[in-house]
Amino acid sequence: MGKDTKQKLKITRLLDDLKSGNDTKFNAAIKSLQVHGDISTIEPLVGLLLTDQLSQSNRSVLIELLSTLNLSDAPDEIMRIIKDENYLKVRPIILSSIWNSKLDYSYFLSDFVEIAVEGDYLDTLECLTIIENLEGPFEERHILEAQLFLRDFIESTGKTKDDRKAVLISEIALLLKDFDLDDDIEMYE
């Protein structure tokens, strides 16, 4: 049996242990996934959040695992899942795991703005928190694309029905303006 096949079987067993309902197996699987998990485990882990198979404490442990992922290619996979309509129910949880993460999501600035304008209040709040914590630097095209999402939002809706969301969108617009100014300043230094 090849090394890849053994790894896949091990991950399958660990994912089964997460669903077992046995806390001892669950905790052992979490510890093992912290060491042996790879990009292929992210979607099944998020999928588990959609079910009622986890106790509240196990659910919290699983969310913590997602928040502490240290895989360099995790941001691409997480963003793919966030945009997947099958996971809308757990989107705020996944967004929260991003701003708790140590991974760099700066490349996805415009994606967060898009989610903020299209999502509900909670999505917007989570995206604002993420954007506030992005380190950059930001590519000019991402800032421009993000500004276009804001402009389209303002032009198409005029005003959101949720005043709280409108305040958050305004804060995002100010952050984008600051990011744009920071880029201009860096060009002249």
Language model: regions and residue ranges:
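Structural detector for internal amphipathic alpha-helices that build alpha-solenoid repeat scaffolds
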Residues: 1-5, 26-37, 47, 57-71, ...
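Amphipathic alpha-helical scaffolding segments comprising HEAT/armadillo-like alpha-solenoid repeats
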Residues: 2-17, 36-50, 71-84, 103-117, ...
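Short, low-complexity, intrinsically disordered N-terminal segments
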Residues: 16-28
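Short, amphipathic alpha-helical segments
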Residues: 88, 92, 106, 118-125, ...
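A contiguous pocket-lining binding segment that forms or flanks enzyme active sites
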Residues: 110-116, 120-132
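Extended, low-complexity, acidic/polar intrinsically disordered regions
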Residues: 144-189
